Amino acid sequence: MAVVSEDDFQHSSNSTYRTTSSSLRADQEALLEKLLDRPPPGLQRPEDRFCGTYIIFFSLGIGSLLPWNFFITAKEYWMFKLRNSSSPATGEDPEGSDILNYFESYLAVASTVPSMLCLVANFLLVNRVAVHIRVLASLTVILAIFMVITALVKVDTSSWTRGFFAVTIVCMVILSGASTVFSSSIYGMTGSFPMRNSQALISGGAMGGTVSAVASLVDLAASSDVRNSALAFFLTATVFLVLCMGLYLLLSRLEYARYYMRPVLAAHVFSGEEELPQDSLSAPSVASRFIDSHTPPLRPILKKTASLGFCVTYVFFITSLIYPAICTNIESLNKGSGSLWTTKFFIPLTTFLLYNFADLCGRQLTAWIQVPGPNSKALPGFVLLRTCLIPLFVLCNYQPRVHLKTVVFQSDVYPALLSSLLGLSNGYLSTLALLYGPKIVPRELAEATGVVMSFYVCLGLTLGSACSTLLVHLI
């Protein structure tokens, strides 16, 4: 097979990802032997002029995770709003203390559980509700919730702390569900595009975390009032969400995007185990199932993505087990010095900025390096190896410690290095698996497969968030 451009590696409506027996054992040959995307007669494949589509998907990737990142990064604001001002000066209300100490864990559970339900609903809606409607509706809900959150910044909630906590959790539930529909719909749509566009979307998600971390540091440095800082913080997110809505509306006007967004006629679902005849891309002998006009077939998708799904789930399980519940409670060993770097800026810098920047670097690496391949046993091996990060983080200066009193790593360098390693491995390994998923199925199943891969992400986040609450209580 001749060497072709990246666009030529996209599927036709009846194509499937195939590898030879040798490439199954060769990690370096991650994406060889894909069938060509042959445009219909008389239809020329357009170019992505000025990388417009790439930039739009990158920006939408930022917007897909920006709400969650802004929520968890504004820790100082939440601690300020949720402090129990009614507690006696000489003591502390145990219930209020529980809200403060385990707020990140509660927030993580509130964000992941509704995501699971919304992903199932979104899968069922793939062929029933147009992706255009799902994206715009979910963006509208996200924008409305963020406007409510922004409006509450200047409201005095000291007399109804628990009520504000309940409102915050409800907002996170709705926000998480809408964000899930938005991100999974966009990701599923990129399954029909060349892989560089999927990579742009995924890298954009990491950039959203980096942007929120940088914005948090700037706000903390520029404003002494945590409420003014949070107001600027949330207003930034609100403005960017409006920008995302405008960029998505612009996407359909680009010739390059319209080419890959053209409707795909229902065709057979190729199992991936049969050999395609050399003289035909769609021989009737290999047709095994017809796609239902309403609900995509789930079984062949699960079968093809089982190994990649495990990798995605376990990567995000380990990540959400540690970040943010464990990371955000690791304090500087020199906190008593009174330095701003060891108090005010320590967590935003060593946890949020380093993790998100490393995550961005890991995701961006996949644009040039795609090793191990989708069928390699090394990929799940590297994924399982990340389990070692759990005890390493616990042995840092996590506070408060109730059961495990010993702090092994007596330097602030360790949490910084571990956060970077957590982010880099999360970005690279998860992006590889997410990129491979929609490319190993026929093009007409790409969007549905994207939703399924998003479900694996959410499953890992849900399991990790639930276990993080238990881990926090055990330390």
UniProtKB/Swiss-Prot annotation:
- Residues with the modification Phosphoserine, per the entry, are 21, 23
Q: What is the effect of changing residue 279 to A?
A: Decreased adenosine transport at pH 5.5
Q: Where are the stretches annotated Disordered?
A: 1-24
Impact of altering residue 274 to A?
No change in adenosine transport
Q: Which Pfam families match?
A: Nucleoside_tran
User: What does changing residue 275 to A do?
Assistant: Decreased adenosine transport at pH 5.5
Outcome reported for the amino acid change (mutating residue 255 to A): No change in adenosine transport
Effect on the protein upon substituting residue 132 to P/R: No change in adenosine transport at pH5.5
Motif, Dileucine internalization motif: chain positions: 31-32
Outcome following mutation: residue 317 to A: Decreased adenosine transport at pH 5.5
Q: Where is the composition biased (Low complexity)?
A: 12-23
Reaction(s) this enzyme catalyzes, per UniProt: adenosine(in) = adenosine(out); guanosine(in) = guanosine(out); inosine(in) = inosine(out); uridine(out) = uridine(in)
Q: Which residues lie on this side of the membrane: Extracellular?
A: 75-105, 156-162, 221-230, 327-337, 399-415
A single Gene Ontology biological process assigned to it is: uracil transmembrane transport
Activity-pH dependence = Optimum pH is 5.5 for adenosine transport. No adenosine transport at pH 7.4.
Altering residue 268 to P: what's the impact?
No change in adenosine transport at pH 5.5
Q: What is the effect of changing residue 427 to S?
A: In HLAS; almost total loss of nucleoside transport
The disorder this protein is implicated in is: Histiocytosis-lymphadenopathy plus syndrome: A syndrome characterized by the combination of features from 2 or more of four histiocytic disorders, originally thought to be distinct: Faisalabad histiocytosis (FHC), sinus histiocytosis with massive lymphadenopathy (SHML), H syndrome, and pigmented hypertrichosis with insulin-dependent diabetes mellitus syndrome (PHID). FHC features include joint deformities, sensorineural hearing loss, and subsequent development of generalized lymphadenopathy and swellings in the eyelids that contain histiocytes.
Cite the domain annotation text.
Contains a N-terminal dileucine motif (DE)XXXL(LI) important for endosomal/lysosomal and mitochondrial subcellular localization.
Specify the protein name: Equilibrative nucleoside transporter 3
Q: Its gene?
A: SLC29A3
